[in-house]
């Protein structure tokens, strides 16, 4: 029954209750009045609940903006130095001190470290260094975030030892670039190796000078003059 009809019934019962004089009739009308009032109350609660549900359904769903980290940039520029206890690597990243602490992560092994900076100005930054020159202490190594800088502290496993290079690869590359002098080889061969190295690394003027000296040397040798 509609709420309007129940309200009319209630008004009529109230009128009858005012006119009734016999107890039995009044008790019956009072019971009916309570019943109708309960029905009206339930109807109103149901109506309010439906209205609230409609309002909830009409609300636009909350849109959660995804956190995009964009692409990952590999870090290739850095500086390093050392103390008796630590090898220190300095990486410059503008604004890195403003990202949450958990966004700057470093994983250490005995001969490597892996830096990952997440969601810095919409990008992630990664730096992986393998084959460190010497072993480090994983437990003793750490990181520090300063203004626009990440400082990686690699604790030397053997203190008071000097690192001439950061990695074994760098050491091998540098050693290959050095002229080789073998005491057991002919001294003139060692000199030729040095000249060859200078020639390969020199500019056009240097190459012309060496070529001229080489030609003159060959001409002297052809004449029996061994001076160079």
Curated annotation (Swiss-Prot):
Domain SGS: 168-228
Domain (CS): residue spans on this chain: 73-167
Compartmental location: Cytoplasm; Nucleus
GO CC list: cytoplasm; nucleus
Modified residues (N6-acetyllysine): 8, 19, 85, 118
UniProt-annotated stretches for the region Interaction with SKP1: 73-228
Region (Interaction with SIAH1): 2-80
Interaction with S100A6: annotated segments: 154-228
Top-rank lineage group of the source organism: Eukaryota
Classification via CDD domains: p23_CacyBP (cd06468)
Keyword Nucleus: yes
GO BP: heart development
Segments passing through the bilayer: none
Cysteine pairings via disulfide bonds: none
Keyword terms, alphabetized: Acetylation, Cytoplasm, Nucleus, Phosphoprotein, Ubl conjugation pathway
Record PTM Phosphoserine, positions in chain: 3, 34
One term of GO molecular function: ubiquitin protein ligase binding
Stated role: May be involved in calcium-dependent ubiquitination and subsequent proteasomal degradation of target proteins. Probably serves as a molecular bridge in ubiquitin E3 complexes. Participates in the ubiquitin-mediated degradation of beta-catenin (CTNNB1).
Subunit and partners: Interacts with protein of the S100 family S100A1, S100A6, S100B, S100P and S100A12 in a calcium-dependent manner. Component of some large E3 complex at least composed of UBE2D1, SIAH1, CACYBP/SIP, SKP1, APC and TBL1X. Interacts directly with SIAH1, SIAH2 and SKP1.
Protein name: Calcyclin-binding protein
The species this protein was found in: Pongo abelii (Sumatran orangutan)
Source taxonomy: Eukaryota, Metazoa, Chordata, Craniata, Vertebrata
